């Protein structure tokens, strides 16, 4: 029998030039709350990373808690997420991008599949089709071996519900200067500390792709992957053999 949790879920969303997305984000979280069985509820944390565009702090919802974190400086997406994490009250967190989509059953289904694992990873839609297929098998790619030898199999952080206590200190204490591989750093650090990833076969998440997505910039990606490897090495996250595998994989991905 699947375990039911009653802890609060914090949906953390960095906002950058994205005020237009806020009504959709609130409605999305409210729909998740309507479907969810957890009694403590959902909080939506909007971590503004644009010092030139303040978010109205009086935003209100009848069914969810909304927290607004305005800023005086631009920190970058990883630091904005960590700032949201520090303000979060939830036992579980979801790091959602401002333009991505959670389906109404997301919270309820992810919590019901979590069990004693550290995360629940759901299936998702990418570019109007299922991201996992015969060439990218869901059951095979969400694994430590794949992440170390093949690349990042998780299309976007919002695909994953994370037990808050499982977020690694290496990730929260090492802010990457170049955005792109910060999600990948998080998953690798989690696998290194023995985190368990529960697989949820439900399609609950949609990744929205724009032409200016950072992940599409190969030069930025290369710089970010190199920085990620340096952080992993400097913090002894993996042994020498593991680091050799990861560096080789990064070079192969971009070759």
Positions of predicted regions on the chain:
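Flexible acidic/His/Gly-enriched loops in nucleotide-sugar-dependent glycosyltransferase catalytic domains
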Residues: 33, 63-64, 79, 107-170, ...
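Cell-envelope/extracellular polymer assembly enzymes that use nucleotide-activated donors
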Residues: 8-10, 43, 185
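Short alpha-helix within the catalytic core of nucleotide-sugar-dependent glycosyltransferases
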Residues: 26-27, 82, 90, 103-115
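A conserved acidic beta->alpha catalytic loop
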Residues: 45-56, 97
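Short aromatic/hydrophobic "clamp" motif used to bind/position activated sugar donors
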Residues: 93
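Glycine-rich, basic loop-to-helix element that forms the pyrophosphate-binding segment
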Residues: 71-88
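Conserved nucleotide-sugar donor-binding catalytic segment
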Residues: 143-221
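Short, well-formed alpha-helical segments that are part of the catalytic scaffolds
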Residues: 18-33
């Amino acid at each position: 029998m699947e375990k039911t949790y009653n802890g609060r879920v914090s949906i953390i969303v960095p906002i950058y030039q994205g005020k237009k997305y806020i009504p959709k984000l609130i409605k999305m979280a409210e729909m998740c709350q309507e479907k969810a069985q957890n009694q403590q509820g959902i909080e939506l944390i909007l971590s503004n990373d644009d010092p030139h565009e303040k978010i109205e702090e009086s935003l209100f919802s009848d069914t969810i808690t909304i927290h607004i974190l305005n800023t005086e400086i631009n920190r970058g997406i990883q630091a904005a997420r960590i700032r949201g994490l520090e303000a979060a009250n939830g036992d579980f967190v979801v790091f959602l991008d401002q333009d991505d989509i959670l389906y109404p059953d997301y919270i309820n289904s992810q919590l019901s599949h979590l069990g004693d694992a550290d995360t629940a990873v759901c299936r998702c839609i990418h570019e109007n089709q299922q991201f996992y297929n015969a060439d990218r098998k869901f059951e095979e790619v969400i694994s430590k071996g794949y992440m170390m030898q093949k690349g990042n199999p998780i299309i976007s952080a919002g695909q994953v519900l994370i037990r808050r206590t499982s977020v690694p200190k290496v990730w929260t204490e090492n802010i990457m200067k170049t955005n792109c591989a910060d999600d990948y750093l998080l998953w690798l650090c989690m696998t290194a500390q023995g985190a368990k990833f529960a697989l949820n076969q439900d399609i609950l998440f949609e990744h929205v792709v724009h032409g200016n997505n950072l992940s599409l910039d190969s030069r930025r990606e290369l710089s970010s992957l190199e920085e990620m490897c340096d952080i992993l090495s400097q913090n002894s996250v993996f042994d020498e053999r593991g680091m050799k595998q990861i560096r080789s994989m990064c070079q192969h991905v971009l070759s």
